[in-house]
């Protein structure tokens, strides 16, 4: 796929843009030959670009993107080089405001586009957040690996009366708290707990049982979680913390493990859950 073809693709996908987040180019999906290491996102007036591997024609690509925003709604470009140590980000065109947030189905989530690694928002779980919003009315929700708590916001907007957010990162939970206030949500029943999930099930169980459980871990986090050996530990605890009619949203962002990995764990360790 040529760089000119990418530009045409971006223009086609930009015709119906609003202030809501939209992925304009998803090279990571493996559908565009030669560009599996490129993603381009629209965040209101910001064009957010990520490179997962060094590109020989990077300067030509960036030149095309600068041409593209001349006729799009974007006024700035942020580039993240995820292949470099620390995954540094920089503003290469224009300026970005001090406070940036993404909009998803009317829900606001605070972003840090210049942070290392992750910005605070994972667009691939949009459909998951829609599911939670549609299925959380009058439910007690457990949000494991909550990070900046987007699932919690979706649950409260959907009518959950209680949400317990569990994550090791106090900083992420603090941002999650801010995200709730950003959406003008009632905080009664919303809690934030900086627990090591694998070591804290007695405390998690004490706050149950739960009517909706969300598991959205990293594939690998040094010293705290490794999907291939630790996911089963969480699945095995589900019968102890789930209500009789509990819904489970089990997620895993791994290029090496497919849905059968999770299905088999549930079949073996929590057979009361049915697909």
Model-derived segments and their meaning:
Residues 1-44:
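Non-catalytic accessory regions of SAM-dependent methyltransferases
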Residues 31-34, 38-41, 57-122, 130:
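Non-catalytic substrate-recognition/targeting regions of SAM-dependent transferases
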Residues 138-147:
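Conserved class I S-adenosyl-L-methionine
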Residues 148-160:
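Conserved SAM-binding loop of SAM-dependent methyltransferases across substrates and taxa
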Residues 162-167:
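Conserved SAM-binding motif I beta-strand of class I
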Residues 168-214, 223:
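S-adenosyl-L-methionine
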Residues 217-218, 224, 251-255:
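Short strand-turn motif at the edge of the Rossmann-like AdoMet-binding core
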Residues 229-275:
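C-terminal substrate-binding/active-site "lid" region of AdoMet-derived donor-dependent transferases
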């Amino acid at each position: 796929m040529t760089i000119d073809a990418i530009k045409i693709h971006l223009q086609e996908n930009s015709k119906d843009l609003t202030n809501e987040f939209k992925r304009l180019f998803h090279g990571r999906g493996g559908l565009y030959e030669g560009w599996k290491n490129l993603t381009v996102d629209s965040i209101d007036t910001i064009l957010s670009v990520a490179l997962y591997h060094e590109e020989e024609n990077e300067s030509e690509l960036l030149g095309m993107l600068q041409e593209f925003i001349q006729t799009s709604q974007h006024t700035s470009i942020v580039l993240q080089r995820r292949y470099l140590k620390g995954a540094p980000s920089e503003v290469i065109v224009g300026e970005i405001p001090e406070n940036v947030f993404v909009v998803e189905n009317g829900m606001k989530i605070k972003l840090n586009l210049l942070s290392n690694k992750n910005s605070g928002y994972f667009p691939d779980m949009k459909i998951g957040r829609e599911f939670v919003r549609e299925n959380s009315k009058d439910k007690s929700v457990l949000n494991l690996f909550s990070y900046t708590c987007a699932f919690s916001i979706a649950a409260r907007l959907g009518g959950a009366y209680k949400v317990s957010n569990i994550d090791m990162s106090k900083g992420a939970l603090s941002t999650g708290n801010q995200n709730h206030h950003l959406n003008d949500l009632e905080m009664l029943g919303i809690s934030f707990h900086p627990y090591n999930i694998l070591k804290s099930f007695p405390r998690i169980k004490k706050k149950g049982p739960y009517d909706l459980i969300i598991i959205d871990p990293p594939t690998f986090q040094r010293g705290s979680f490794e999907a291939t050996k630790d996911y089963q530990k969480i699945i095995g605890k589900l019968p102890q913390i789930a209500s009789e009619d509990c819904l489970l949203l089990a997620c895993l962002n791994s290029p090496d493990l497919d849905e059968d990995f999770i299905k088999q764990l549930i079949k073996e360790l929590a057979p009361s859950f049915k697909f």
